[in-house]
Structure formats: structure tokens, C-alpha cells
Regions:
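Bacterial Sec-dependent N-terminal signal peptides
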Residues: 1-26
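A non-transmembrane, solvent-exposed segment enriched in polar/low-complexity residues
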Residues: 18-159, 163-166, 170-189
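Alpha-helical repeat scaffolds
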Residues: 182-199, 236-247, 274-285, 314-315
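Long, charge-rich alpha-helical interaction segments
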Residues: 208, 213-274, 296
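N-terminal "domain-start" segment that seeds a small globular fold
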Residues: 295-328, 390
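Thiol-based oxidoreductase modules, predominantly thioredoxin-like and allied folds used
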Residues: 365-380, 389-401
Length: 415
């Protein structure tokens, strides 16, 4: 190649580099008290370091695009990051929901995903099964109609249709229990027509696994169809029924691996390391080979190992109604029954009756019943305790959630 040929080649390469568009996400936090946003793309979590003015610029690499999640404090917002686009995100205050704005060529799809039309889905669980199914169809069609008005490209629109469907399908798993509660018919069981509809909705499509809604929707549908006949709540029987359905009715290896991991992980979170864990691990080890999934599972297994019976208790320090510190050492020589609750939790209020019966049953034993509130507002907790004095020890956790983290308490109430 001659001298001029080499120069032309260099110029072509320079022009190609200049024309290759970067994928950029900019963050502008206005009025924030120091919350650090996090971006989850393709399952990978990235912390965003903003400067003193609340600004951060993130250059994404090839492959870091598609559906994503923005974590901001307790808020979780959907994003769609398009290759070669710039997305500018403005968040006002410490709560992103309802206080977020988008600019740049990546703005339209993200504004759509975070619009009110795509959020406020409510379900009437008192409806009978056919009516409930019709309600879901109407909600899906309503969202489809809104999507069609946006004029997005065909590929995104098709993926969105699947995301909408499986997001809405999640309500199907809740229906039997919520219908029983709302109607007072605690013996309710879904009929064959309802179950037949569920089976038709189970769709194996590996390319949809990039959608969190597809993952959750499929997990819900398979869980419902595999455990509907169980009248008692037995976590071990439930997870083995879920495994059995996945193994004998699904064929896509990637989907099978995902669902086995999903159910085993949920079992570990809910039950911990118990006498049945070896059975769960045998199935898990046979079907789950993905290193990332196994790493995540091992991490939660190691955490569960710290709280098996006989392990040292968490050395907590909370405060009582008078503001005095109360710590684990104060109960040396006693058995503790600790209940984590909040004043606003409806299940907490309903279960108080069972809690009081338990107290009475063991009132002559060497057991101390301790109710620990994780309310954000101490004044609200104090008001409730003073208005409804109970026999148990009442403590306030405050903002430190290390106790809940240690015992992996994700929902309340939890004892």
C-alpha cells in the first residue's frame, strides 16, 4: 500500500470512529439530599457517582442497552436504553416516582414507560373467574391502545406488547387467595375453565427472558398451575410441585434453568436452610449451570447459613417508648420471640389477635415477646403504642435496618 493509500485508510477509520454514536445516560439530581442512583442493565448493577451539583454522565459499552431499571432510594423505575442514543434524566427531590423528566433522543420511550397510563393498574378480585379474566383482557387492550398511539418502531412495540401481557398476568396468581379474602369464601378453588386459560398463557420464548415482566409472569403462571390443588401452605411441597411441572412440561433449557433457580431462590429466602434443603439442592445442581445464577444463589445460601438454629443472635440495640436503649444483652437467659411490624401494615393489625393468644399461651414460660417497629415516623409509632398498650415489650428500630438485613426480612410482619 502506498503512502496515499495509508492516509486514506486512516481517514476512513477516523471518520468511522467519529460517526459511531455512543450510548450516553446523563443524570441531573435537583434538590436531592444525597441519594445515589443505581442503574441495572442486563442484570448488572452500576452505582452512579454524581458530583456536588447532582450531575453524572455514564458512557455505556456495547451490549449495555435494552430494558433497564433505575434504583433511586426506594423507587424502582423502568427505563429503555437504546443503542447510540443520549438519555438525560432529571429527578426532582428524593422521590423519583412522579418527579422525573426525560430529554434527549432516548426520551420518548422512557416518558412512555413512566407515564401514569402504564402504572395505575387496579384489579377487582371480587369478580368471579370469567369476569376477572375479562377484566385483565380489557386492561391489556387499554394499554395496547395507548402503546399504538405512540408510533414506536415495530420491534419495540412487539416487545412492549409481551411486557404488558405478562405484567398483567401476574395478577392471576394472586386471584384465588385474594378472591377468597374479598368474598369471604375461604374454601374457594379455581375451576377448570380458569386453569385451562392459565395453561394457554404459558408461553416458552427464550428471547423474552430479557423482560423482567416475562420472568415474573411465567413464574407466577407456572406456580399457579402447579400448586392450585394444595389446600395447606407447605413451602417444601410447593417448591417440589413447581420443580415437577417445570421439568415435565417445559422444554426450553434456558427457561427451565431460570424457573428452577427462581423457585429454589424463593424457597431459600422464605424458609432458609431446613431439613429439606438437600432435596432442593439436588434439583438445583442438576438444572442450573449458569455461573451468574449460581453465584447469586450461593451468596444468599451463605447468608442463610448465618441464621440457622443455634447460630449467634444479632446483637441489636433499639429504643423503648421512653427513649431508653434496649439491647440483646438485657434479655440474657430468656427466650425471645421477636415480631417486626409497622403501624400501617394491614396484615400486622389482623395478626395482632393471634399474637395476643400466643402471649397468653406462653405467659408462664421463660419467653419474652418483643414487638419491634420499623416505622419511619417514631411519633406515629408512639401514638399507636400509647393508644393500644400491649403486654409485650415495645421497641422502635429507627432508620438502621441492619437487623432486618441480617435476618433477611423483606416484608412485614415477620417473626
Amino acid at each position: 500500500m502506498g503512502k496515499f493509500g495509508g492516509i486514506i485508510l486512516i481517514l476512513i477509520l477516523l471518520m468511522w470512529c467519529c460517526n459511531t454514536r455512543k450510548t450516553v445516560v446523563e443524570f441531573n439530581l435537583i434538590g436531592s439530599s444525597g441519594i445515589q442512583p443505581e442503574l441495572v442493565v442486563n442484570g448488572e448493577e452500576r452505582e452512579i457517582e454524581v458530583d456536588d451539583s447532582g450531575y453524572a454522565k455514564l458512557m455505556l459499552t456495547e451490549g449495555e442497552h435494552g430494558y433497564a431499571t433505575l434504583k433511586y432510594g426506594k423507587d424502582r423505575l423502568p427505563l429503555f436504553i437504546e443503542d447510540g442514543t443520549t438519555l438525560r434524566i432529571y429527578i426532582y427531590g428524593d422521590h423519583a416516582k412522579g418527579n422525573i423528566r426525560f430529554e434527549g433522543d432516548g426520551s420518548p420511550k422512557n416518558s412512555y414507560l413512566n407515564s401514569q397510563v402504564m402504572k395505575n393498574l387496579s384489579f377487582d378480585y371480587e369478580l368471579n373467574a370469567p369476569e376477572f379474566l375479562d377484566q385483565l383482557k380489557d386492561l391489556i387492550q387499554e394499554q395496547f391502545h395507548y402503546l399504538d398511539t405512540m408510533g414506536f418502531d415495530a420491534a419495540f412495540a412487539e416487545m412492549e406488547r409481551n411486557r404488558i401481557k405478562f405484567s398483567t398476568y401476574k395478577a392471576l396468581e394472586n386471584y384465588p387467595l385474594y378472591h377468597a379474602w374479598s368474598t369471604g369464601n375461604m374454601d374457594y378453588q379455581p375451576d377448570t375453565a380458569y386453569l385451562s386459560c392459565i395453561k394457554k398463557l404459558i408461553k416458552e420464548d427464550e428471547k423474552l427472558l430479557v423482560l423482567k415482566e416475562y420472568q415474573e409472569g411465567m413464574a407466577s403462571l407456572v406456580s399457579l398451575i402447579s400448586t392450585y390443588h394444595m389446600k395447606e401452605l407447605d413451602a417444601y411441597k410447593q417448591v417440589m410441585a413447581q420443580f415437577d411441572y417445570v421439568i415435565h412440561h417445559l422444554t426450553n433449557e434456558t427457561l427451565v434453568e431460570f424457573l428452577i433457580d427462581h423457585y429454589a431462590y424463593a424457597y431459600l429466602l422464605g424458609v432458609g436452610i431446613d431439613e429439606h434443603i438437600d432435596d432442593v439442592l439436588r434439583v438445583y445442581d442438576f438444572y442450573v449451570k449458569d455461573p451468574a445464577l449460581r453465584k447469586r444463589f450461593q451468596e444468599i445460601y451463605d447468608r442463610c447459613a448465618k441464621i440457622v438454629p443455634g447460630s449467634p443472635a444479632f446483637d441489636f440495640m433499639f429504643t423503648d417508648i421512653a427513649g431508653q436503649a434496649v439491647e440483646l444483652e438485657d434479655f440474657r437467659g430468656k427466650y425471645l420471640f421477636i415480631n417486626v411490624w409497622t403501624t400501617w401494615g394491614v396484615p400486622c393489625r389482623y395478626e395482632n389477635l393471634a399474637w395476643e393468644k400466643l402471649e397468653k399461651e406462653f405467659e408462664d414460660e421463660n419467653i419474652v415477646f418483643v414487638a419491634v417497629s420499623c416505622d419511619n415516623d417514631r411519633a406515629v409509632w408512639e401514638k399507636r403504642v400509647r393508644e393500644n398498650p400491649k403486654g409485650e415489650v415495645q421497641l422502635y428500630m429507627g432508620s438502621d435496618r441492619s437487623f432486618m438485613d441480617f435476618y433477611m426480612i423483606r416484608g412485614i410482619r415477620r417473626s
